[in-house]
């Protein structure tokens, strides 16, 4: 007889998995935090208030969400659901957590460079970091430099949904270094042995504010840019000195077409280090500079409390939250 299953979350992840779950389990209840859904049906199941979860007889609970699973997991445990009843999400599975621990234990340097893709970044900079054998985080379309440089990142990260969708095949083809993705990108990018999943403490549905930084990969704070997430990952890994390079913090998108709220259509913007970075017609998310700046301030305060230095080694740009030291001075 199939075991009795409770499901938390009734969004797109449930729609994707419901038929498979029906075959494998006896579904006894579906729960969601959206009070407007309570009492309504989805996929033939009545949606209930999570506060009533212990009134249902179930053996296991599955979180059907690829966002804020850390919050949901903590919520159901607080409601009295035994931890051992919760089916681990990709973020919380033992294998993923072990990968994070292994990387932290393998770190053998105190300094790391976090490389933004701003126009100030040059191939000469990347080659210099390569020749100096520096630990580096890089992001998104950094692979555009690979044909012209021997530089390869120590760690690669992507978190933006449109970046992942637009470049999934190229990102999936990247190998030779760990790749960090948030849980929600598992809908878009392939899982492989070199992929590590991180969780994010996302704000309200409109993404109107930054969230508190964390050094735990299950619950990184959100600052509307992958750079903020990488700083937190670097802190988790144990780096005590973090240099930013190519983080110009100076976007211009007045010439772009607006597709929908906060989504632009590329018309030749030149905010990045490579001429082919933004092909015409590509959709991209407009930066939320005020949110990012507020998160940089939170990160500076967070890092100072735990004895970590964040230094801006970008050539020029408009980011003045962190003290500046030139790349040449840093490598001298």
Where are these regions (language model features)?
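Hydrophobic, helix-prone linear segments
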Residues: 1-6, 52-54, 234
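Metal-ion/cofactor- or nucleotide/acyl-coenzyme-handling active-site neighborhoods
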Residues: 71-332
């Amino acid at each position: 007889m199939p075991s009795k299953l409770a499901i938390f979350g009734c969004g797109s992840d449930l729609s994707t998995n419901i038929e498979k779950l029906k075959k494998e389990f006896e579904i006894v209840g579906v729960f969601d935090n959206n009070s407007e859904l309570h009492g309504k049906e989805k996929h033939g199941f009545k949606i209930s208030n999570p506060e009533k979860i212990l009134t249902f007889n179930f053996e296991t609970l599955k979180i059907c969400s690829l966002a804020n699973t850390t919050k949901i997991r903590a919520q159901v445990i607080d409601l009295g659901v035994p931890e051992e009843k919760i089916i681990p999400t990709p973020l919380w599975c033992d294998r993923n957590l072990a990968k994070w621990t292994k990387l932290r234990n393998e770190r053998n340097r105190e300094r790391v460079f976090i490389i933004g893709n701003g126009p100030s970044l040059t191939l000469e900079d990347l080659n210099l970091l390569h020749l100096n054998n520096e630990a580096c985080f890089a992001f998104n379309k950094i692979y555009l430099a690979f044909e012209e440089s021997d530089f390869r990142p120590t760690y690669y990260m992507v978190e933006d949904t449109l970046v992942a969708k637009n470049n999934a095949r190229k990102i999936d083809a990247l190998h030779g270094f760990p790749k960090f993705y948030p849980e929600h990108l598992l809908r878009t990018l392939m899982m492989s042995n070199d992929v590590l999943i991180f969780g994010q403490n996302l704000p309200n549905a409109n993404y109107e504010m930054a969230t508190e930084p964390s050094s735990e990969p299950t619950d990184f704070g959100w600052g509307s840019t992958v750079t903020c997430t990488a700083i937190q990952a670097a802190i988790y890994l144990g780096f005590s000195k973090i240099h930013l390079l190519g983080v110009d913090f100076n976007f211009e998108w007045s010439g772009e077409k607006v597709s929908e709220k906060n989504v632009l259509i590329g018309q030749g913007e030149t905010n990045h280090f490579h001429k082919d970075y933004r092909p015409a017609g590509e959709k991209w998310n407009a930066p939320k500079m005020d949110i990012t700046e507020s998160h940089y301030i939170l990160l500076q305060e967070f890092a100072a409390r735990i004895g970590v230095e964040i230094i801006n080694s970008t050539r020029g740009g408009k980011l003045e939250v962190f003290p500046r030291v030139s790349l040449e001075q840093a490598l001298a």
